[in-house]
Structures are given as structure tokens and as C-alpha cells.
Amino acid sequence: MEDSSLPVVPAPIAAPGPAPSATAPRVPFHCSECGKSFRYRSDLRRHFARHTALKPHACPRCGKGFKHSFNLANHLRSHTGERPYRCSACPKGFRDSTGLLHHQVVHTGEKPYCCLVCELRFSSRSSLGRHLKRQHRGTLPSPLQPSPGLPPLSSPCSVCCNVGPCSVCGGGGSSGGEGLEGAGATSWGLAEAAAAAAASLPPFACGACARRFDHGRELAAHWAAHTDVKPFKCPRCERDFNAPALLERHKLTHDLQGSNAPPTQVWASGGGPEVAGEGDASEVGAAPQTWDAGLLLSPTGAGVPKLEALLPGDEGSGNDQAPAAAAEASSEDTLYQCDCGTFFASAPALASHLEAHSGPATYGCGHCGALYAALAALEEHRRASHGEGSGEAAPDGEGNQAAGGPGPGSSSRSKKIFGCSECEKLFRSPRDLERHVLVHTGEKPFPCLECGKFFRHECYLKRHRLLHGTERPFPCHICGKGFITLSNLSRHLKLHRGMD
């Protein structure tokens, strides 16, 4: 017998829709409240529940109501403790398939969520949200409002709210100008969307380079790379860029130089420094591995002065005046970059670093086995990668003369010229700054494949992995029990001393 106290839910009415064209997909079920169209009657019934405040599916234990029966089924598992969705890599279980999918990212290392400003990727939506709030506060435009100068976006699809021609329902939306179709994109029909889904490919394809995207707004931003449109302008030097990531990378040059930076010095083919003008500065900064911050050198020596010419006072160089003039003109704000990405505050420091690229690798790291040609390069590697201070290292062969005194670049390594924009701390190298920034972003990019924990630095992960293994390098000489770290062994020995 039916309960008369329950309210009667009005049945959804299939409103008559517009006459379908020959190419339009068949969506015969229309909502009488908002006019949206659906391909199946079950989708229309599920959608119609949004227009009513009724939640007919109630939990028999806590009384909470749900609009759909499958939502109630998932909720009941919170009372029973049932976790039918098991992970194949670890013994963890989950109440629904969504939780299992989010967990599997821990084992696969996949990072499906990408920041559209700096192109960093994250494993969860919450991590991406924290990154956007901390690093790009107020810099992100509305998802449906393109930046000035970009090709105009179409308005959202009336069925699924996607921007541009819809890959789900085939709707074209109300175009604003040419929209995305004028941006070299192919058509977005149901056939293409189904083929892309079957091949696990994003549905939006660029007609110029065949690159695919998950959303129409990403395709619109990407299309600027194929055109002369550069809507992103640097507020300091008025240079234009066609992508926000390129603009953020360019801003680092101003941060490294400071607000009152000297003119850029570029070594020309003639051998002397030239002050680059506005047009030259734009050409230099266009290369992906060059910066507007100082002397541009290459370890191969092609088209640049020789290594001896960089050190002032050397005899036998064919052009002594040009390097000397460059050394006098350099200041504390001028940085010198090697092609490997390392910055130096002086030309002698860079010249000493270049020996690590050209000379024989005779100095070995006792931690990872990396070989270096110069002792200074080995000390920098041990300090940056393994957290050790400057110490003596025994070379594999002869040539330990550099261990007796500081190298040419030792004074520059003591300077802290790389600053954090969040807490204003200074660091000696870009690597140290990158490691420190992880404290502010909360990122932990090193996962443990055994238990799923994440760590901020690789050394922390290596130490944690000992927990899953049988190796215990620090044994107790009294009871024979082994420990992973020396600090744990010290605490254990205090127990023996307390029992004695």
C-alpha cells in the first residue's frame, strides 16, 4: 500500500524540440523546465530531479535523503564499512569507484591536473587548487573569458556547458565571431568524440599541429602559438608573449636582475661586449635557454671568446681588452649563465665551471657515483643533491691540487643571490631555491610505491624506503637489534643504559 504522505513528484514531460537537421545528432528528450535536451529518457529523469527539492531515497539508519538510488547505495557503505572497490597494487579498499581512481594515481605517478599558467602538473585537483592560490593569486582569468587578443571563444554549450562546439552532444553554442572553429580546429561531432574516447585521447584537436586538448579554452590559448597574437605583456619591459608560461619564465630575468638592472651585455662575433638595444634584447630573450641577465656563453666555444680570454691578466690571448672591459662593467646584479642552467656572479666563476664540462671526470661522488672534472663542481653537487657542506673529496686519479685552497669561483658560491618571492629567503643556487619553494607549494613529488606516501625530497624517500626493506645498517651491539638511522639507535641505547 502506497504512503499518501509522500509528495507526488511530477513526471518529466518530453517537450517538443526544434526539428533536427540531417547532420545534427538525435536528442529527442527535452526538459520542459529549462529546455535542455537528452539522448535517453533515463538521463532526462535524472536531470529533472534537479528542478525539484525532493530526495525520495532516504537512508534507513540516519534519515539522510538522496536524489538517486546509486547515491544512497554509496552512502550505505559508510554505515556498513563495506569497501568493494579494491586496489590491485595495495590492499586498500574504497566505497566507490571515484575514490579508487583517485588513489591509483599514487601508484601510476600520473599527474592529470595541469596549471595553465606555469604548466606544472599535479596528481589531484586539490593540489592544483592550493598551487593556484599560493602561486598565481589574481592572475587567472575566468574560464569563459579569454585574455585580450586571443581568438574569441564560443559561449557555453546549452546542454553540457562545454566551451565551443560540444563534443558530447554535438551542439555548436552561440559563437562569438569565428570562435574556435576559426582557430584552425577541426569539427567536434559525436563521431570524433567517440573515436577520441575509444583511443583515450582528448577530444579537442588543433588543425595546425594535431595537438589535442581536454577543453576548448585550452585549444584557444594554444592557437595563439600558431598566430602573431601575443596578448601577454611584460609590465617592466613591454615585451609580448603568446603564452602565460613564457611570460612567467621571462619575469624571472627581471627578478634575478632587480628593478634597476644594467643594460644587457652580449658577446658579439667580433669578440667584444656590445650593449644590446631594445630590438636586440627581444631577440636574445627569445631563445628558450637564454636569459636577459648577463653574459651568454656556450661550453663548446663556438662564436664566443675562448676560455682563457675570460680570465683577466692571462697572457697570449688575442683580445685582452674586451674581457677586461666586460669585467669592469659587470656588477653584482649581472649574472653569467652556462648552457646547463647554472648561474654565476662573475666570469672567472663561470670559467671555472666550464672546466667541469670539458676536462676529464676524475672526482667521484661517494653517494650516487657521479663524476666531475673539477673539485668545485663535485662540492656543489654534494651540497645541492645530498645536503652536505663543502668537504674534501678524494679524486679517482691524480690532480688533487685544487683541494689545498679555494677555487676561482669559491667567493661567488658564498653569495646568496636567488630570492624566494614568498618569504624573501636567499639561496646560493637555483636548485636550492627550487627545493625551498616546495615548502610553500606543499608539493611532494617523490612517491613511495610500497605504501603510497609522498615526500618533498628524494633523500627523504630513500630513507623511508629502508622501512620496507630488511636492511638495518645500524645494529645494537648489546641486543643485536638493527635500526635505520643513527638517531634511532641512540634512543635505543638510552633504554639499555636505563636498565643497567
From Swiss-Prot:
It comes from Mus musculus (Mouse). The keyword ATP-binding does not apply. InterPro entries: Krueppel_C2H2_ZnFinger, Znf-C2H2_ZIC1-5/GLI1-3-like, Znf_C2H2_sf, Znf_C2H2_type. The modification N-acetylmethionine is found at residue 1. GO terms for biological process: positive regulation of transcription by RNA polymerase II. Residues 256-267 have a biased composition (Polar residues). GO terms for molecular function: receptor tyrosine kinase binding; RNA polymerase II-specific DNA-binding transcription factor binding; transcription coactivator activity; zinc ion binding. A zinc finger (C2H2-type) spans 29-51, 57-79, 85-107, 113-136, 204-226, 232-254, 336-357, 363-386, 418-440, 446-468, 474-496. The keyword Metal-binding applies. Signal peptide: none annotated. May be a transcriptional repressor of NRL function in photoreceptors. Does not repress CRX-mediated transactivation. Transmembrane segments: none annotated. The lineage of its organism: Eukaryota, Metazoa, Chordata, Craniata, Vertebrata. Residues 1-24, 255-284, 306-328, 383-415 are annotated as: Disordered. This is Flt3-interacting zinc finger protein 1. The gene is Fiz1. Interacts with FLT3 cytoplasmic catalytic domain, following receptor stimulation, in a kinase-independent manner. Does not interact with other structurally related receptor tyrosine kinases, including KIT, CSF1R and PDGFR. Interacts with NRL.
